A protein has these predicted regions:
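Histidine-rich, glycine-flanked metal-binding segment
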Residues: 1-53
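Histidine/acidic-residue-rich, glycine-tolerant segments that coordinate divalent metal ions
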Residues: 90-93, 105-240
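Conserved beta-strand positions in the central sheet of alpha/beta enzyme cores
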Residues: 87, 158, 220, 252, ...
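His/Asp/Glu-enriched, well-ordered alpha-helical/loop segment
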Residues: 264-298
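Short catalytic-loop micro-motif centered on adjacent basic/acidic residues
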Residues: 85-89, 193-197, 251-255
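Divalent metal-coordination and catalytic microenvironments
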Residues: 10, 25, 30, 49, ...
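Glycine-enriched alpha-helix->loop->beta-strand junction motifs that scaffold or abut catalytic
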Residues: 153-154, 213-218, 243-250, 270-276
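Metal-associated gating/positioning segment near the N- to mid-region
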Residues: 47-107
Length: 298
């Protein structure tokens, strides 16, 4: 057999055994096949000292390019980072998701899935006041209609709990979000509820948030250092977070430029607490503090 490519000397990951080892890979028409070490006629790629990975999935970015002040073009960001699929984390809501789908998702070579924002206008970042998360503005019927229209594209809901978005509403926005997520699941659609938890107001403490989340829901910006954090007075990950993980709550790093801290990461890493690595790439931090997903993996 003549192979299209042979990748030699690369480090591959055996996810079944959780092991790393050096291996040659043989490719024909874009697929890995059994190899013959004596074969020739292929283009040889020397991957000595490098990891050879499948396409990565990044769980948090903002791709409404030209539609809000966070948006970046996925095809500029993702290929150089080895990302083939990515989640847009609530850039748009029911007011503007159609535009994002037509002008962003359909045109992208990178496969983009989305969490639709519970607030109709989507994320409003970079201002003193963000999107106002008034639970009265969360329309379950409208949101469900979008899940029915775009079941292949919309995979969950996004809510941003922060001083600038939910202060004064307490946990009511999250309570409403949980009700909507449960209704969508009851209708037969997979639905992750992803909750941004950074710079939390006093009326929405971490303990209250965790009590409301269901197994499979996601707590985002785990290592942030604005206001209440995940640590107790001894710098240990708090018991309520460890208990929440045991009952199936997912914890996402969400290493945004202002929503993470190296000291927090270092202390939490001792317990290998996070389950999802993500880098919330957006136009305002593409060339700044954030680093690619592969750096987070290392």
């Amino acid at each position: 057999m003549v192979y299209d490519y042979i990748i030699r000397n690369g480090i591959v990951i055996d996810f079944q055994r959780n092991q790393f080892y050096k291996k040659d890979l043989y490719l024909v028409k874009g697929r890995i096949v059994e190899g013959d070490p004596s074969a020739d006629g292929a283009e040889i790629i020397d991957a000595e000292g490098k990891y050879v990975l499948p396409g990565l999935i990044d769980m948090h970015a903002h791709y409404f390019y030209g539609g809000n002040n966070l948006g970046i073009n996925a095809d500029i960001l993702c290929p150089s980072q080895g990302i083939t699929t990515s989640i847009d984390a609530g850039s748009t809501g029911t007011m503007n998701f159609d535009a994002f789908y037509r002008n962003g998702m359909l045109d992208s070579m990178t496969e983009i899935k989305a969490y639709i924002n519970l607030i109709p206008e989507g994320v409003k970042a970079g201002y003193k006041r963000g999107e106002c998360c008034d639970p009265d503005d969360m329309d379950c019927d409208q949101i469900l209609a979008f899940f029915k229209k775009y079941p292949h594209a919309i995979k969950g809901l996004k809510l941003r709990i922060a001083e600038e978005t939910t202060k004064g509403f307490g946990l009511e926005p999250l309570e409403k979000a949980v009700q909507i997520a449960e209704k969508i699941r009851w209708e037969g659609y997979p639905c992750v509820l992803a909750v941004h938890c950074a710079n939390l107001p006093e009326d929405a403490p971490i303990s209250g948030i965790l009590q409301l989340l269901k197994p499979g829901d996601s707590y985002t910006h785990l290592y942030q250092n604005l206001g209440e954090t995940i640590f107790d007075s001894d710098r240990k990950v708090r018991k309520e977070l460890r208990d929440a993980r045991k009952r199936g709550i997912l914890f996402e790093t969400g290493n945004g430029s202002i929503h993470w801290s190296i000291p927090n990461l270092t202390d939490a890493y001792k317990t290998a607490f996070s389950r999802i690595l993500s880098v919330p790439m957006q136009c305002c931090n593409l060339f700044g503090k954030n680093h690619p997903s592969v750096c987070s993996m290392q």
